[in-house]
C-alpha cells in the first residue's frame, strides 16, 4: 500500500518536516516510510484504528523512544531545518521545545503551583514574582486560573479529571514550547470536560503548533486544520481536514471515516 501525501500549501509554513521515516520496536516495523509536513501554528490530527502507528509517530517528534534501547527511528524529522534524529541537541532541551500531554492526566505529586513551576525551574531562573506571573499566565492559557487561583498550594490530585488534564496542558505550555503534542487528551474525560479541552486547543494554535492523536473522528473534524489517516504503520492520506472528511482521495480513508472500515 502506498501513501497519498498531500503536502501543505506553499503559503503555509511547515514547522516539522518528516521524510522517509521508519520506526522499529526491535524487529517490528511500526512506521513505514512516512512523509509529511506539519504546518506551523495549526492543529494537525492523526486518526486511524488502534495499532496503526499514530501515537508512535507522535512520540518520534520529541524522541520519547530514546528512553528504550530496543526502539529506533531512521530517516529525517526536521524542525526549523534541524534533523532531530541526528541532532546532538540535549534531549531535555528538545522536550522544552516540544511539549507533550498524555492520554491519562498525570499531575505531579505536588501542589498546583509547583506542577507549573517545576519545568520552568529546569530551564529558567525566575524571581518569585516572575514565577508567580508565569504560573498565572500558564493556568490562564489553560482556562484553569479562575478555578485554581484560590488553591494553588493544594495538591493537583484534588482537581477533577478534566481540571487535571488542563493542569497538564498548563504545565506543558509553562516552559513556552514551540510544539505541543496531545496523545488522546480527552479519552478519559466526560463530554463537558472534553468540550473545554477542545476550546482550549482552538485557542492554543494561535501561538503553538499542535498535533493531536485521537480515536474520535468527530473531534478531529471539529478541532483540526489538517488530518492524517494512518493504517498498519503507513500514512494513507494527509491533507486539509475538510477535504479529508468530505472528499478523501483514497477509498481506504473514506471507508474508515464512513464506518465501513474492516
Curated annotation (Swiss-Prot):
Predominant location category: membrane
Pfam families in UniProt: ABC_tran
UniProt keyword terms in alphabetical order: ATP-binding, Cell inner membrane, Cell membrane, Membrane, Nucleotide-binding, Phosphate transport, Translocase, Transport
Membrane topology: Peripheral membrane protein
GO CC annotation: plasma membrane
Entry EC number(s): 7.3.2.1
Catalytically driven reaction(s): phosphate(out) + ATP + H2O = ADP + 2 phosphate(in) + H(+)
UniProt record similarity statement: Belongs to the ABC transporter superfamily. Phosphate importer (TC 3.A.1.7) family.
Function, as annotated: Part of the ABC transporter complex PstSACB involved in phosphate import. Responsible for energy coupling to the transport system.
Xref: NCBIfam families: 3a0107s01c2
Name of the molecule in the record: Phosphate import ATP-binding protein PstB
Organism of derivation: Cupriavidus metallidurans (strain ATCC 43123 / DSM 2839 / NBRC 102507 / CH34) (Ralstonia metallidurans)
Amino acid at each position: 500500500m502506498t501513501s497519498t501525501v498531500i503536502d501543505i500549501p506553499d503559503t503555509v509554513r511547515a514547522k516539522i518536516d518528516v521524510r522517509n521515516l521508519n520506526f522499529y520496536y526491535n524487529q517490528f516495523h511500526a512506521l513505514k516510510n512516512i512523509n509529511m509536513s506539519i504546518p506551523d501554528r495549526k492543529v494537525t490530527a492523526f486518526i486511524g484504528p488502534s495499532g496503526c502507528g499514530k501515537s508512535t509517530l507522535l512520540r518520534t517528534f520529541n524522541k520519547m523512544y530514546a528512553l528504550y534501547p530496543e526502539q529506533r527511528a531512521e530517516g529525517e524529522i526536521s524542525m526549523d531545518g534541524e534533523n532531530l534524529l541526528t541532532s546532538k541537541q540535549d534531549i531535555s532541551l528538545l522536550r522544552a521545545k516540544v511539549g507533550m500531554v498524555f492520554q491519562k492526566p498525570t499531575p505531579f505529586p505536588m501542589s498546583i503551583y509547583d506542577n507549573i513551576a517545576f519545568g520552568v525551574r529546569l530551564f529558567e531562573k525566575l524571581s518569585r514574582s516572575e514565577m508567580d506571573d508565569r504560573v498565572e499566565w500558564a493556568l490562564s492559557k489553560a482556562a484553569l486560573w479562575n478555578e485554581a487561583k484560590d488553591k494553588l498550594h493544594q495538591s493537583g490530585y484534588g482537581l477533577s479529571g478534566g481540571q487535571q488534564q488542563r493542569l497538564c496542558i498548563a504545565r506543558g505550555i509553562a516552559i513556552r514550547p514551540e510544539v505541543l503534542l496531545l496523545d488522546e487528551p480527552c479519552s478519559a474525560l466526560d463530554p463537558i470536560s472534553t468540550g473545554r479541552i477542545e476550546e482550549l486547543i482552538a485557542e492554543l494554535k494561535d501561538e503553538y503548533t499542535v498535533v493531536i492523536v485521537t480515536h474520535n473522528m468527530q473531534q478531529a473534524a471539529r478541532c483540526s486544520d489538517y488530518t492524517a489517516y494512518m493504517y498498519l504503520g503507513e500514512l494513507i492520506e494527509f491533507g486539509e481536514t475538510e477535504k479529508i472528511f468530505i472528499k478523501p482521495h483514497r477509498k481506504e480513508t473514506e471507508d474508515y471515516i464512513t464506518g465501513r472500515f474492516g
